[in-house]
Amino acid sequence: MKRAVLALAVLLPTLALAAEANAPAKSEPKDSKFLVDYLSQTQKDFLKSIDGLSEAQWKFKPAPERWSVAEVAEHIILSEEMFGENISGKVLKTPAATAEQKAKTQGLEDKILQGIPDRTNKFKAPEKLQPASKFASAKEAAQAFKARRDANIALAKTTPESELRSHVSGPSPMGDLDAYQWMLFMAAHAKRHVAQIEEVVADPSFPKK
């Protein structure tokens, strides 16, 4: 858990810059159904992005300094685990948020949804979230991600929205987030890197098979 929090402390400042730069003028209310749907859709998008890739496609790097699909996928999975541990092991165990704490989280949903997936600004992942060739195939990675995301979706489904909104924690340069917002952040982060996978696949030198 401590390692997850430390990794978050490194990852979030850079992502928050993107969120602030791309935030819409007004936030719209979000409910439990929206959260579950967003988690489910970003899960489907990730699984689709790596489905059926050959070993050559899985390991292809557009350039020496750029990540392969395998490396991006591993980063997504490592991050999913980190966010999940932070939400269930820390955020939801904090004391009930005060009215002042809740007030500070108002309007952050659309900043997360619009800013985090935007890849205009690109940043280096913290060391703990750097890929290390953990998954030999796309199928293996898909199974690992699905298991973790299924658990996070189950948490979103079984935890009342009022409970998700009642627990607030950091670290986040956007300000502390409630558990609902942390879940949105997690899904938006996956969406950001699915776009990165699509960039790799779109490279002219990407293997045909």
Model-derived features: positions:
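Amphipathic, well-ordered alpha-helical segments in soluble domains
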Residues: 42-49, 79, 83, 119-123, ...
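Hydrophobic packing residues in well-ordered alpha-helices of helical domains and bundles
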Residues: 35, 39, 138-145, 183-186
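N-terminal secretory signal peptides
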Residues: 30-78
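Domain-scale detector for complete catalytic domains at protein termini or as standalone homologs
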Residues: 14, 33-36, 40, 120-123, ...
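Short, helix-capping/interhelical loops that line the mouth of catalytic, cofactor-
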Residues: 19-34, 85-143, 171-177, 204-209
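Positively charged n-region of N-terminal signal peptides that target proteins for export
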Residues: 1-4
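Short, contiguous alpha-helical
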Residues: 60, 64-108, 150, 157-158, ...
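Bacterial N-terminal signal peptides
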Residues: 7-16
